[in-house]
């Protein structure tokens, strides 16, 4: 009879899986490793895991037999059908109360489905976002578990031990919420990551193309910013990238083809925001900017055909403008996170999740790509008011955007005058202005829809009552009501 010695099993021995196993081992947990290609198990035990307490299994049945009850199995395999296939293989060897954890990059609807399907079979399912890449997996990732809450007490000691630690020592892992909440929050995290990166690249282009600064000069600016409110992993690595020289002494970044790739998680966030009717405009623009960058050949042709401003030279005080750039970047970053939290708030309503908003900010403070000092302020805002309607309504963020407002407007205006694209900086400001307007021109839009399609409209003094006007004789005839604008 096989002895149950392992605290947790892990399926999937790519680098992420191996590193998570070694991380768990470092924290005193016995892990049983399994891979579909069983030779990988032997190679791992003979090399990376040599001298550790890691044990191996050559079948799913052996894996489950080596696990202490309640059994805990973590999957780090390709999202999609592979996850379902392994779940099907595991089920005959599990019993009521056992736990399956999907730590891959699954889309949240799949996690919702799996939680419900497995609950009906007595199995506790957890869909957990894992952020931080290979190094994070080895030395401390940001973990975002959600699903069947009964599983949390059993996996909490492992997850909070192996997770990254924030500067104050807090573990970057908390229970997120029900069903697909863990993978949903990870999706929004990735969308915000898209937004943060796009904002930084726009500032980079303004500094380089607009102000004519060298890469070393720009690196100095990012280094200075990293000592203040903008202190973050992405600002830090941007500094390092700008300083990095190729073998010929030239900045390597200038030789990299300007076509950005994407794996689709930013697109997931943008599409989800459209489905929910939440204006997550900054992340959307970040996705579209990557799409535009991929049209390299067309942009090369356009650069020789399309006319820009008559004069694109900056004539102001550079030192003052650089300080304003930092303020604009900070304000736009606030909007990006406000939009992300708006989206999570709506999803929580739609799925009846009780999201741990302060805990989410805490989870993102270490071990992940968007980690920053800034997140501590978000945690404070939601700790003070767990039902906060909008991050911009918190006193700290309300004052911060107000303080940055003049600089923010000047930066976007100067970029327009210089012909430098700033889709993320600009859309953040446009969102801010739209949100603070009690009256928007959608009244005219509704009248147009009613004119050509009889879609009806509400009056200000009678909301909820829908009326239609026959506009004939006051600008034209009513068209057929088959239009859907």
UniProtKB/Swiss-Prot annotation:
NADP(+) binds at residues 12-17, 35-37, 77-79, 105. Transmembrane segments: none annotated. Its EC number is 1.1.1.44. PROSITE patterns: 6PGD. SUPFAM superfamilies: 6-phosphogluconate dehydrogenase C-terminal domain-like (SSF48179), NAD(P)-binding Rossmann-fold domains (SSF51735). GO terms for molecular function: NADP binding; phosphogluconate dehydrogenase (decarboxylating) activity. NCBIfam families: gnd, PRK09287.1. Homodimer. This is 6-phosphogluconate dehydrogenase, decarboxylating. It comes from Cunninghamella elegans.
